[in-house]
Amino acid sequence: MTNWLPILLAILAGVLTPTQGAINNKLTQFVGNPILSSFISFIVGSIALGICLLFTKNPFALFYQTKDAPLIAWTGGICGALFITAIILAIPRIGVTMTFSLAILGQ
């Protein structure tokens, strides 16, 4: 039996990824700095995730479990920040379609 929820979530992620790039590019046009735009994007995302975390069981107990995580486990945010910033820098120069086509090629 197929589990449709992960399939739908993956499709939603595929739709949201270029949408996020276009939205962040628009924000960059207003703030004038792609790094600031990336920072704002991560702050807003962190707030949204924090709200979601409040609805999980024992959200603050989960933080205690991170004490034994290896250093490499903490670097995912760096990868995300580099990805978002690269996307913001690329979209105005080569467009959304080309940017994400090349991002997929890089995978």
Spans of features found by a protein language model:
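Structural motif at transmembrane-helix junctions in multi-pass transporters
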Residues: 30-33, 86-102
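A generic hydrophobic-segment detector
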Residues: 1, 106-107
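Hydrophobic/aromatic residues within the transmembrane alpha-helices of Major Facilitator Superfamily
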Residues: 15-19, 47, 78, 105-106
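Hydrophobic core positions of alpha-helical segments in small-molecule transporters
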Residues: 40, 102-103
